[in-house]
């Protein structure tokens, strides 16, 4: 019987599943690594509340062990005043206990030299009181019924397979993980595996169902999955059927679904992202969504429960499980103790033997003997911990004087504080970091208007740019700016020889415009070039044929002389091939096509397709037909005129064959009116209009405050990492460019800014760029510290004389940056000269065995939005995102809105990914690179089978087993009047909620109040001491 759901029930299943999956953040493919906040789905909660919820959902630790914070405290990185204030504030919410000075006890607790929890799990106050006073354990009979509510609560919080595992040690949940992961690998594979799941184009659940019905592995495992599938029609009906079979009511579905989906949150996050990525080729071809994944896991889980019920007698419905717990309470308490590991070691075998006999009376008798001993052991452990704590707090007498009910109050207070301790340490570290920053930044001074720097350089806001900017400014007359590394231009990019479009912009943006990369010297027979245009014009879902183009089409499209004369059809698989030769010099097609150009291109393409069709279908060679005949066939195929054609009179083609040929031109070769419109739409995406280019350049210049005093060179510096044998290579690239290198955006922006028509319009808007100012794209290679210049062949001849001076300055800054960076990677490199350090950086970047060619963005803590003059005299040691902004150029606050809504939010994602990857690398990071296995070309697993690893690898945030990154929330500093910044924050709702919710620590430095800092703390702005003014700066020519 197949259960078909009505529309209402179907929508309810889907909406419930979608909402249940929202706590799981998106996970992007590894080749475009996107930094993300692992708790993004919980950002509607205050930070402290969200970390508690995140710990439950992801079974993860949210703060580091106490000993790590104590080490930083010894190093002076913890603000003692904040520690004292937070302990005092939180002590007020703890239950009053006679003789217990909570601030003193909590301070002593945070200084204890171990990482144990303050309260032993499951301990009772009366047992602790007895142990403190040397009394024997209670001889009172164990009330089994009193133990069951807590047991039922723990089981109810789990999925049904997990609950059965907890009582019977069956391993169903792990087996279910294995089955789901294997099926996900088969379906989502992106041409890495030799075998892929058939029928994938029908969607995940449909393809999986067909394969599973015939899967011999299911039979060997004695799983009757086919029987379940016979009762369902699709994913939605499968979800309903399984939930009903397990006896779980609809009111419990949201919580249950969330537990199911967070079990493998990496795979869930990937499926969620993939379903939302409409541009992603693999998602278009092989669709899947969260309901498919949920249904597969539920169906497989039910099959495992049924198999366990048949062979072990375990329950397969939630109400049956509850009945077992109530009817066989003593047995279930013992089972849970044994399989959870919460058991006295010398009793484990005895309990196992008793359970294996299945005798209820024996279980009851054993529990009566065992449980008092277990509780006494817990009481003794807790008493010893309290005595140690009381001694540290100088309160031993107060502890001894506590009555049993007071001991309960003490334990409850310690329980209440336990999840807060990490937050207190974090606040104290952030307090120290804020104090440190406010002593480093200085009241900015504008340079004299007649002093023009030799060169200006725009860098990404990435923290790795801070050291090289600092060194570049100090080796010569350079002025640097910080801007999001996509330079404000969202780029859809089709690279030379690539088969698919990539997005070079923040993950929250979808670019409308497409830029093509084309060889500067075209080879008419070059298939890479053909595939570039072919991909633009042809929708892969409609046809696997690539168009055929001629020299004239290319001339009209690109303003170049050569293109191709006769080109062969290419399928998608061929488009993906790479020619293993050195990449030629290329140009970017940045300008919009006119309608006339687009029409001409399509006409030429269609003519070429007709020539090919004549040869392929009718064996008529090109030299036997003239242009008039080709034009006639095109007009008829486009339904602009009626037949017959000259094919009949010239070549004797029968009428029926002629009609078939015309139909093939339309259906197979794309010579069709509808497809023509589609081609025009695709061509319409190429390039940017003049208005768009002017807007992008004007916005960027205004945002960073560069509206006058332009240098001869303005470097537009993207960044990227170059490493070998590194699945996480894209994590070293530019997050603002979608996890790709920033050089594409740098080249696009420079080309726009150098265009005379753009400059003419900018001058009319009040920004005059001198004729001899040249915007030059460059790439900061963060793994080698080099700055590589691009498009030098376009450099005006009058600039060549200055080029070597520019390169000398860049090389000097690179060497100094390497000398600063190498000792952080390798302590033994501390004594290296700058040139030696640079050579070492280059060697590490190409070393296949090197698991850490750089620290990436580890160490990030600050986001500074303001003029460079605030920080130009500060050594921020690569800890700050530096965003250039001049509030005086932004009277309405629109530019600040954009900075807060995009770069600051992305900075917060980066910051919190490092935070959580550090505090629990096993669950929220990705573990050691040593055990990583690339999976399906889109992710990595640990070993051969695991959840997708979503965070940062251990080698990025840890050194020798200890945290290298210091987990603190982003401290965002804004240079602007307080009321002005406050109004802007009110308008940017997302950032406002992040600040109010404690996800971002905010500071405003008000230039209208003598550069007085205001720190947002506990819901209000706190005044701090005004900044000092820097010493007078000298400017060289």
From Swiss-Prot:
GO cellular component: plasma membrane
Cofactor(s) this protein cannot do without: Zn(2+)
Pfam families assigned: DabA (PF10070)
Keyword Transport attached: yes
GO MF, one annotated term: zinc ion binding
Main location: membrane
Membrane topology label: Peripheral membrane protein
Record's keyword annotation contains Glycoprotein: no
InterPro entries assigned: DabA
Signal peptide start-end: none
Family, similarity comment: Belongs to the inorganic carbon transporter (TC 9.A.2) DabA family.
Protein name per Swiss-Prot or TrEMBL: Probable inorganic carbon transporter subunit DabA 1
Native source organism of the sequence: Nitrobacter winogradskyi (strain ATCC 25391 / DSM 10237 / CIP 104748 / NCIMB 11846 / Nb-255)
């Amino acid at each position: 019987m197949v259960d078909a759901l009505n529309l209402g029930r179907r929508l309810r299943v889907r909406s419930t599943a979608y909402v249940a999956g929202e706590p799981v953040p998106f996970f992007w493919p590894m080749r475009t690594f996107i930094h993300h906040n692992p708790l993004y789905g919980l950002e509607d909660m205050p930070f402290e509340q969200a970390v508690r919820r995140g710990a439950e959902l992801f079974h993860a630790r949210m703060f580091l062990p106490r000993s790590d914070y104590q080490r930083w405290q010894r190093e002076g990185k913890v603000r003692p005043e904040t520690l004292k204030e937070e302990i005092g504030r939180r002590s007020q919410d703890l239950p009053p206990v006679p003789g217990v000075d909570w601030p003193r006890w909590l301070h002593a607790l945070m200084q204890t030299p171990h990482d144990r929890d303050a309260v032993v799990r499951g301990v009772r106050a009366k047992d602790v009181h007895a142990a403190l006073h040397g009394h024997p354990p209670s001889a009172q009979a164990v009330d089994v019924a009193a133990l069951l509510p807590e047991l039922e609560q723990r089981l109810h919080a789990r999925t049904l397979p997990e609950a059965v595992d907890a009582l019977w040690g069956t391993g169903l949940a792990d087996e279910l993980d294995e089955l789901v992961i294997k099926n996900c690998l088969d379906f989502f594979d992106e041409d890495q595996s030799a075998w892929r799941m058939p029928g994938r184009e029908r969607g995940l659940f449909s393809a999986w169902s067909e394969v599973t019905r015939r899967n011999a592995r299911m039979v060997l495992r004695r799983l009757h999955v086919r029987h379940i599938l016979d009762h369902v029609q699709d994913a939605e009906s499968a979800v309903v059927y399984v939930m009903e079979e397990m006896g779980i009511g609809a009111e419990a579905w949201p919580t249950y679904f969330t537990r199911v989906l967070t079990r493998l949150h990496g795979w869930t996050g990937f499926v969620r992202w993939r379903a939302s990525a409409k541009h992603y080729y693999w998602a278009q071809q092989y669709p899947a969504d969260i309901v498919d994944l949920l249904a597969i896991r539920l169906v497989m889980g039910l099959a495992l429960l049924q198999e366990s019920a048949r062979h072990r007698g375990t329950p397969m419905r939630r109400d049956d499980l509850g009945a077992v717990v109530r009817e066989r309470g003593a047995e279930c308490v013992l089972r849970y103790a044994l399989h959870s590991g919460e058991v006295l070691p010398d009793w484990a075998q005895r309990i196992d033997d008793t359970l294996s006999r299945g005798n209820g009376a024996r279980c009851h008798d054993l529990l009566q003997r065992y449980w008092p001993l277990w509780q006494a052991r817990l009481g003794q452990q807790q008493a010893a911990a309290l005595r140690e704590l009381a001694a540290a707090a100088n309160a031993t007498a107060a502890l001894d004087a506590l009555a049993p009910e007071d001991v309960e109050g003490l334990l409850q207070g310690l329980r209440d504080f336990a999840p807060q301790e990490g937050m207190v340490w974090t606040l104290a570290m952030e307090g120290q970091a804020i104090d440190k920053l406010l002593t480093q930044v200085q009241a900015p001074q504008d340079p004299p208007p007649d002093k023009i720097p030799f060169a200006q350089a725009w860098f990404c806001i990435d923290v790795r740019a801070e050291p090289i900017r600092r060194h570049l400014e100090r080796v010569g007359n350079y002025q640097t700016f910080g801007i999001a590394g996509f330079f404000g231009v969202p780029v859809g990019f089709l690279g030379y020889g690539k088969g698919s479009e990539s997005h070079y912009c923040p993950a929250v943006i979808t670019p409308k415009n497409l830029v093509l990369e084309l060889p500067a010297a075209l080879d008419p027979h070059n298939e890479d070039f053909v595939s570039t245009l072919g991909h633009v014009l042809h929708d892969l879902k409609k046809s696997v044929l690539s168009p055929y183009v001629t020299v004239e089409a290319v001339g009209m499209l690109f303003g170049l002389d050569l293109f191709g004369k006769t080109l062969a059809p290419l399928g998608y698989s061929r488009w993906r091939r790479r020619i293993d030769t050195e990449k030629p010099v290329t140009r970017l097609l940045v300008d919009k096509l006119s309608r006339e150009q687009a029409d001409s291109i399509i006409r030429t393409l269609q003519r070429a397709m007709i020539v090919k069709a004549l040869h392929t279908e009718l064996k008529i060679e090109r030299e036997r037909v003239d242009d008039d005949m080709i034009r006639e066939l095109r007009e008829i195929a486009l339904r602009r005129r009626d037949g017959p054609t000259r094919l009949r009179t010239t070549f004797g083609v029968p009428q029926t064959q002629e009609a078939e040929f015309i139909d093939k031109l339309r259906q197979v070769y794309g010579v069709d009116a509808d497809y023509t419109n589609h081609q025009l739409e695709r061509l319409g995406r190429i390039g940017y209009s003049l208005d768009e280019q002017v807007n992008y350049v004007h916005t960027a210049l205004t945002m960073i405050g560069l509206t006058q005093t332009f240098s001869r060179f303005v470097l537009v510096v993207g960044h990227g990492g170059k490493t070998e044998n590194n699945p996480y290579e894209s994590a070293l690239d530019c997050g603002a460019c979608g996890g790709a290198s920033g050089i594409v955006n740098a080249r696009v922006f420079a080309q726009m800014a150098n265009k005379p028509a753009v400059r003419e319009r900018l001058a009319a808007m009040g920004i005059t760029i001198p004729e001899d100012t040249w915007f030059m794209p460059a790439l900061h290679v963060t793994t080698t510290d080099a700055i590589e210049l691009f498009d030098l062949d376009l450099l005006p001849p009058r600039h060549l004389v200055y080029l070597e001076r520019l390169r000398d300055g860049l090389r000097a800054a690179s060497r100094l940056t390497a000398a600063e960076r190498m000792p952080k990677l390798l302590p033994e490199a501390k004594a290296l000269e700058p040139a030696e350090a640079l050579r070492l950086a280059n060697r590490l970047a190409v070393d296949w065995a090197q698991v850490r060619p750089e620290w990436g963005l580890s160490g990030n803590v600050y986001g500074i939005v303001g003029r460079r003059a605030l920080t130009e005299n500060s050594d921020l040691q690569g800890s700050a995102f530096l965003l250039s902004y001049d509030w005086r150029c932004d009277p309405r606050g629109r530019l600040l809105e954009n900075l807060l809504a995009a770069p600051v939010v992305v900075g917060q994602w980066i910051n919190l990914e490092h935070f959580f990857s550090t505090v629990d690398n096993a669950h929220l990071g990705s573990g050691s690179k040593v055990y990583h296995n690339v999976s399906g070309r889109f992710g990595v697993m640990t070993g051969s089978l695991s959840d997708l690893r979503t965070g940062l690898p251990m080698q990025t945030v840890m050194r020798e087993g200890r945290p290298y990154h210091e987990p603190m929330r982003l401290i965002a500093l804004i240079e602007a009047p307080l009321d002005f910044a406050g109004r802007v924050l009110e308008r940017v709702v997302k950032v406002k909620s992040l600040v109010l919710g404690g996800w971002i620590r905010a500071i405003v430095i008000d230039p209208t109040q003598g550069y007085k800092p205001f720190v947002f703390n506990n819901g209000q702005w706190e005044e701090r001491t005004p900044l000092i003014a820097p010493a007078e700066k000298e400017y060289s020519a």
